[in-house]
Amino acid sequence: MGRGGDSSGQAHPAAELAVPSDRAEVSNADSKALHIVLYGKRVDVTKFQRTHPGGSKVFRIFQDRDATEQFESYHSKRAIKMMEGMLKKSEDAPADTPLPSQSPMGKDFKAMIERHVAAGYYDPCPLDELFKLSLVLLPTFAGMYMLKAGVGSPLCGALMVSFGWYLDGWLAHDYLHHSVFKGSVARTVGWNNAAGYFLGFVQGYAVEWWRARHNTHHVCTNEDGSDPDIKTAPLLIYVRNKPSIAKRLNAFQRYQQYYYVPVMAILDLYWRLESIAYVAMRLPKMLPQALALVAHYAIVAWVFAGNYHLLPLVTVLRGFGTGITVFATHYGEDILDADQVRHMTLVEQTALTSRNISGGWLVNVLTGFISLQTEHHLFPMMPTGNLMTIQPEVRAFFKKHGLEYREGNLIECVRQNIRALAFEHLL
């Protein structure tokens, strides 16, 4: 399954970042010099603004900031080797530049990654991936067949489609992180991307829309002003025990801790509209993705003919399942400002901004392994089937370095989010 070639690193070369962003973000600011700090060197990345598959926004976020751990998280050893030439031409970072990657914790984290590589935890897991793929495609297409052919209960068919689309999102996420097919970069990047685009078509989301959001989220999780995933205003304002925020809530927002759970049901519809708008604003460049979306909705209209009344139920259930899971693992956690993060290792930032959903293997499968959010953010290129295996070592690592390993069952995680929204006790 794509074995051979460069399979020892966490990811793929710079030209094939796992989660590319939107090139349209590059504007007249192209001429501004951009420098990031890698391995203690101040590297000029200005010329990569238009060609960097991860987008130029990450360069601006990490301007004169240590990006070593983030760079290694999404690039292979081959790409790191390619960077050596630029490092030799680069000057040392200013003496006052924080270098968390060179701290004892940073070095310990790098050693842990190397142990995982040596143990084969980055190797592909074909049976796991086949199982997950079957959980997506079988209910989706079986449900569509039931609806179109009039076999069995239309409600049952609609529920199966909703369940398949729900799991489809998590599986597409894995492929687009390039954590499924491993081996020769030239082959497996294309295979992972092709699978991701196919799954995007099946569920009706544009891949480039997802990438534009997700790329930045991973490298600056819960960083105020940089992470697009935590921009939930005006619908939800996370107070997090701050009186200054509580006092600014309007009359509607003062009910947010009550409508938080129900509002998860509209997320699928919201994301679909956002995805369509994202593509529409980038035509004709994104014509292929626009045609894929048109084809998806044409097929849905054909399949659900005579049962259109079930479509709201499909999107409500899918949105609720996805939203309640995603929000449980990040949104109620710490929000960090850029100055704080400059001094943090990737592990420290992850410890403050991620929360796992406990419950074992079944919960992991039913949440697309996003329940292991901490491990996923530390090792985004690792096949999800191996995240449970390394969990005890990650716990021990956190304990060794005095970090809190945050987790709870789904109900506890939802309560954590509600507490972060509460405000009455601050007035």
Swiss-Prot record:
<keyword id="KW-0443">Lipid metabolism</keyword>
<dbReference type="InterPro" id="IPR001199">
    <property type="entry name" value="Cyt_B5-like_heme/steroid-bd"/>
</dbReference>
<dbReference type="GO" id="GO:0042759">
    <property type="term" value="P:long-chain fatty acid biosynthetic process"/>
</dbReference>
<feature type="transmembrane region" description="Helical">
    <location>
        <begin position="286"/>
        <end position="306"/>
    </location>
</feature>
<feature type="region of interest" description="Disordered">
    <location>
        <begin position="1"/>
        <end position="24"/>
    </location>
</feature>
<comment type="similarity">
    <text>Belongs to the fatty acid desaturase type 1 family.</text>
</comment>
<dbReference type="GO" id="GO:0016020">
    <property type="term" value="C:membrane"/>
</dbReference>
<feature type="domain" description="Cytochrome b5 heme-binding">
    <location>
        <begin position="36"/>
        <end position="84"/>
    </location>
</feature>
<keyword id="KW-0812">Transmembrane</keyword>
<keyword id="KW-0276">Fatty acid metabolism</keyword>
<dbReference type="Pfam" id="PF00173">
    <property type="entry name" value="Cyt-b5"/>
</dbReference>
<feature type="short sequence motif" description="Histidine box-2">
    <location>
        <begin position="213"/>
        <end position="218"/>
    </location>
</feature>
<feature type="binding site" description="axial binding residue">
    <location>
        <position position="52"/>
    </location>
    <ligand>
        <name>heme</name>
    </ligand>
</feature>
<dbReference type="GO" id="GO:0046872">
    <property type="term" value="F:metal ion binding"/>
</dbReference>
<keyword id="KW-0479">Metal-binding</keyword>
<dbReference type="InterPro" id="IPR036400">
    <property type="entry name" value="Cyt_B5-like_heme/steroid_sf"/>
</dbReference>
<keyword id="KW-1133">Transmembrane helix</keyword>
<keyword id="KW-0349">Heme</keyword>
<keyword id="KW-0813">Transport</keyword>
<comment type="function">
    <text>Fatty acid desaturase that introduces a cis double bond at the 8-position in 20-carbon polyunsaturated fatty acids incorporated in a glycerolipid that contain a Delta(8) double bond to yield (20:4(8,11,14,17)).</text>
</comment>
<dbReference type="GO" id="GO:0016717">
    <property type="term" value="F:oxidoreductase activity, acting on paired donors, with oxidation of a pair of donors resulting in the reduction of molecular oxygen to two molecules of water"/>
</dbReference>
<feature type="binding site" description="axial binding residue">
    <location>
        <position position="75"/>
    </location>
    <ligand>
        <name>heme</name>
    </ligand>
</feature>
<keyword id="KW-0249">Electron transport</keyword>
<feature type="short sequence motif" description="Histidine box-1">
    <location>
        <begin position="178"/>
        <end position="182"/>
    </location>
</feature>
<keyword id="KW-0560">Oxidoreductase</keyword>
<dbReference type="GO" id="GO:0006636">
    <property type="term" value="P:unsaturated fatty acid biosynthetic process"/>
</dbReference>
<feature type="transmembrane region" description="Helical">
    <location>
        <begin position="261"/>
        <end position="281"/>
    </location>
</feature>
<dbReference type="Pfam" id="PF00487">
    <property type="entry name" value="FA_desaturase"/>
</dbReference>
<keyword id="KW-0444">Lipid biosynthesis</keyword>
<keyword id="KW-0275">Fatty acid biosynthesis</keyword>
<keyword id="KW-0408">Iron</keyword>
<feature type="short sequence motif" description="Histidine box-3">
    <location>
        <begin position="373"/>
        <end position="377"/>
    </location>
</feature>
<feature type="transmembrane region" description="Helical">
    <location>
        <begin position="189"/>
        <end position="209"/>
    </location>
</feature>
<dbReference type="InterPro" id="IPR012171">
    <property type="entry name" value="Fatty_acid_desaturase"/>
</dbReference>
<protein>
    <recommendedName>
        <fullName>Acyl-lipid 8-desaturase</fullName>
        <ecNumber>1.14.19.-</ecNumber>
    </recommendedName>
</protein>
<keyword id="KW-0472">Membrane</keyword>
<dbReference type="InterPro" id="IPR005804">
    <property type="entry name" value="FA_desaturase_dom"/>
</dbReference>
